[in-house]
Amino acid sequence: MLIKGLNQGVLHMQETYKEIEKKDWAAKLMAIVVVVTMVTSTFVLFAPEASARTGTGSFGYVFKDSAESDGPTYAWTDIVSSGTKFLGSTTDGSQGPFDIGFDFEFYGTSYDEWYNGGDNGYITFGGAVSNAWTPYAIPASQLGTTAIAAGWFDGGFCVSKNPNSGVYYETVGDAGSRQLIIQMQDQVYWSARDGTSYCNSGSAWATNTLTWQIILNEGTNTIVLQYKDATGGSYYDNEYLTAGIQGIADGAQHGLQYKYRSTPSNTIADETAVKFVPPPPKRNDLKLSATTIPQPMSLAEDNILGATVTNNGVNCDTAG
């Protein structure tokens, strides 16, 4: 499994290269200190922050849903026929790891694998999490540290009435803009699973099911939750469904919740899309590309320390 931490910084300079040369010993030392400090310090590149109907997470993720005028467009791509089905029976156990198909950055860390949380409506990164059937407010320790929940509640499958019930996944698209689609098909409340009276009798609890997707987008690292049918037959799936994202960054737990049980509303409307957008990436605009250190070092006039700095930024210094 590939997990890659990111450590980046930003500084803006006008010149592409600068040669730092000082004649006296104190100035030589100061030149090196300044260069090293500029390269290793973390500076923030400010960019317009996307607006969100219900706010921004502590890490900087924002979300909008398709009910907003500038929100995402609901566009369902069904993968029941084309995708890989790996779960078709009721279980609280986890499955995986499965390949994402590309590197996906989430809360500042890149992942190439994911795990499924059984029939309970969540996925995790960095390790499996089982038996999390009761939804809590996000971020929730019950989901581990890094997770995406789209239909988190005590789920199950009534396969006898819904033969396509299960969890499917497929990576689609061309390199650079691929998508991982994870589809929960015909999810029901646990009490309506196979073998129960609700399932056996064909109750609305078993036949009016939930179908939704988690979509990971390559390059943009955005996340889309899509709900084809989010109004099931049971009070418990409509009211208890919880959705959001959470992860660890800079040693702290972060999370952004779209819905927790009956808050902010009892149900999610059918044919809804919810898009989570990460904050603008930090960048290394100033790079120390070469140094010149004379050997042996001395206080002589011609004993010159040199440092070449490359500007990878997009802005220029201004006089002042």
What spans do the regions from the language model cover?
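Sec-dependent N-terminal signal peptides
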Residues: K22-V39
